């Protein structure tokens, strides 16, 4: 469903202002330890709205200049829900590379919220998503260094999906990678895929 631009801006703005975001948590399992490694925070908009689906919610936010504000609101809602539910392990938070230098991330606001919620920074993993082109590599490094110094860890989503993604992996050197499903499907019978994944 395509929404008129003005309606989209009003609807996304209302979702942000009124706290109408609903985090859901996808478990990440550690098979060796037979325990939860953590949970990835995913977001949904209001159930009765076209913005319930995250692809439509974020597309509307991007088209109306509200993408950074929405991403910030998603992080806050996810952190609060994670603490309220008392979930074990790490929290994987999706962050676009362009938002790494967002003042609300760098000025200590996120760390203060973590402190208020009783969540240690070393339980939070910043998961870089590649849904936008990286135009400021030095800036991205600066942002990552800022968070690593405070105890956060870094993950990359869908490693192997494209050349830019592989470059990001070599530049960022993340603590965690999520490997694109192409390299996992049939890995038991494909030595090339097996060695690629082992090399990660």
Residue ranges and their predicted role:
Residues 8, 71, 140, 165, ...:
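The cytosolic transmitter module of two-component sensor histidine kinases
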Residues 47-51, 75, 79, 158:
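Short acidic-capped amphipathic helix/loop micro-motif used as an active-site/signal-coupling element
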Residues 67-139:
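Catalytic core of bacterial c-di-GMP phosphodiesterases, primarily the EAL and HD-GYP domains
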